[in-house]
Amino acid sequence: MATKFPKFSQALSQDPTTRRIWYGIATAHDFESHDGMTEENLYQKIFASHFGHLAIIFLWTSGNLFHVAWQGNFEQWVLNPLKVKPIAHAIWDPHFGQPALKAFSKGGSAYPVNIAYSGVYHWWYTIGMRSNQDLYSGALFLLVLSALLLFGGWLHLQPKFKPGLSWFKNNEPRLNHHLSGLFGVSSLARTGHLVHVAIPEARGQHVGWDNFTTVLPHPAGLQPFFSGNWSVYAQNPDTAQHLFGTNEGAGTAILTFLGGFHPQSQSLWLTDMAHHHLAIAVVFIVAGHMYRTNWGIGHNLKDILDAHRPPSGRLGAGHKGLFDTITNSLHIQLGLALASLGVITSLVAQHMYAMPPYAFMAKDFTTQASLYTHHQYIAGFLMVGAFAHGAIFFVRDYDPEQNKDNVLARMLEHKEAIISHLSWVTLFLGFHTLGLYVHNDTMIAFGTPEKQILIEPVFAQWIQASSGKALYGFDVLLSSSTNIATQAGSNIWLPGWLEAINSGKNSLFLTIGPGDFLVHHAIALGLHTTTLILVKGALDARGSKLMPDKKDFGYSFPCDGPGRGGTCDISAWDAFYLAVFWMLNTIGWVTFYWHWKHITIWQGNATQFNESSTYLMGWFRDYLWLNSSPLINGYNPYGMNNLSVWSWMFLFGHLVWATGFMFLISWRGYWQELIETLAWAHERTPLANLIRWKDKPVALSIVQARLVGLAHFSVGYVLTYAAFVLASTAGKFG
């Protein structure tokens, strides 16, 4: 007899109902729960999957390069990056009529195309690519790399090449290799590429496979390096008149500390970036030699952690026991990794627009908006995932004996204090922020706008001033010419930085007022509420006052019957589920704020944001409603235009989002009845009843229905806002 899906669970494969399929899919990646799984095999499977993951990433990037080279307009764009619209790829759609063919043939193409809003053109241009040939070479290289990684993944599943468990748990060598190799050497390689290829190309000097061994990146060669006279590499930088991509106004410096932006491209100086990556490379390569391996020198991580004990002795055992706890729990490792990656992704969102690293990207407003929104949403999902795996760690991997009185145990012991403090913060922020907004709404509605409560963000303005913003008149740190901080940096990076921060032509330290003060606190409310739900979910994952034995029920149980006074909605999974809604809510406010503030600045109409953002109706009317007009008019009785695709996506996003509620607001009985009815109708419908199935249709479980609802809600939410951002920005700025 053929074995049924899933092969990894005998119990599930013998289930006679449709539960077999859904639970099979749901637990396919929960390797720990599979039949016959050993710890060693678990690590080997996950390790091999990393190769597959990298292969997919490189294949995807290769596809980007290939399609732009084949169907894009990279070479035309390079000649005029500010005016030519970058093409991502062609569109072939048999439904297109003449108006659609005409509307979507843009960016200088004779056929319908998609415009690229990802910033890849700016990225490839900045790193020195100039021709389609360069793009094809890159695509081919990444394709080969992808194939090699797939082979590597396969190889590491073969008996002779499977690493043993001790190799996976060998922390110090892994840390050394990741610090020196992953961060250090890759940063050094980045510096090398910038110095040898990107900077010469930015100065009009072509560097390719044909001449890279003969073109000196600096006239003095390596002589200053070996003689210790390193400052030579910083002399004669590009001038303020430099035209990017030509030698007009170009210098010879390769490692500088100019500060600020290249006046024409409005991006960070390439020579500053090279210097930055070189410094990081040195720091990380040194850091990668700090931990003890086969030779008896260097730090031992267990010793370091065990030595981390609060001095008085009243605060417990500190980090004792953490070494083994973290080494033996993949969930806490994943939780820490996701949290770190989440933070850095959000930082990327912030820095990508405030300090654009790629030439001319600052002037491609739709790309700026897309990249910010994209990275903030990803950061949100990563952070929620971090807490989810933190909760699974407490359910599956946490050993109270091993962690007696250390930081983990103490967090669990005073979780009531942590949770209640977070609760007070959210209540305070929620009532006060909403109170101010609603008061202002009422005053506007009654025609007395002067009675609004408007609070200047003086502390934030003071911080901006200390970084050099002169507008507010604070005489502090970098905004004071006599301050020691100003004098210390005045000969190197400071003039460029001060010019940039006060120019008004970029997004560095934007001028803030009462509207910013309010939305800042609304976002703080969202962040603290999401954190409250996630922290409570993780800290209560093992048990709570109501249900002390939660751990025995696992991570994602739905309820435990009515016996204890009703135990529904209290598993760690339920906390994750609720937190995702709050996360989306918060990122929504963050991106609304960023987008509205920026489109008013880009249109030279900052007053609109300043005046309308102090009350809720202003947000609904002057941001959401006003900017949705290109979506509402994407197609109408008179035909269509090149925003029609976003209008359709806007409608479709709403549909997906609304479908989510169908799963969220109904319970099991409804589903079972619905399925029985559908099955009954199917069996009595001619032709359709030729198709039979053996599994008895059963309703989705409570947890499954919620997951399906949550997935639709999230996907629809992001899809709707993506279409809104793209259409409202592209509709204004092309």
Swiss-Prot record:
Annotated localization: Plastid, Chloroplast thylakoid membrane
Record EC number: 1.97.1.12
Residues that bind chlorophyll a B3: M662, Y670
Binding site for phylloquinone: W671
Entry binding sites for [4Fe-4S] cluster: C559, C568
GO molecular function, one term: 4 iron, 4 sulfur cluster binding
Catalytic reaction annotation: reduced [plastocyanin] + hnu + oxidized [2Fe-2S]-[ferredoxin] = oxidized [plastocyanin] + reduced [2Fe-2S]-[ferredoxin]
Binding site residues for chlorophyll a B1: H654
Cellular component GO terms held in the UniProt record: chloroplast thylakoid membrane; photosystem I
Keywords associated with the record: 4Fe-4S, Chlorophyll, Chloroplast, Chromophore, Electron transport, Iron, Iron-sulfur, Magnesium, Membrane, Metal-binding, Oxidoreductase, Photosynthesis, Photosystem I, Plastid, Thylakoid, Transmembrane, Transmembrane helix, Transport
Family: Belongs to the PsaA/PsaB family.
Main function: PsaA and PsaB bind P700, the primary electron donor of photosystem I (PSI), as well as the electron acceptors A0, A1 and FX. PSI is a plastocyanin/cytochrome c6-ferredoxin oxidoreductase, converting photonic excitation into a charge separation, which transfers an electron from the donor P700 chlorophyll pair to the spectroscopically characterized acceptors A0, A1, FX, FA and FB in turn. Oxidized P700 is reduced on the lumenal side of the thylakoid membrane by plastocyanin or cytochrome c6.
Record's protein name: Photosystem I P700 chlorophyll a apoprotein A2
Lineage: Eukaryota, Rhodophyta, Bangiophyceae, Bangiales, Bangiaceae
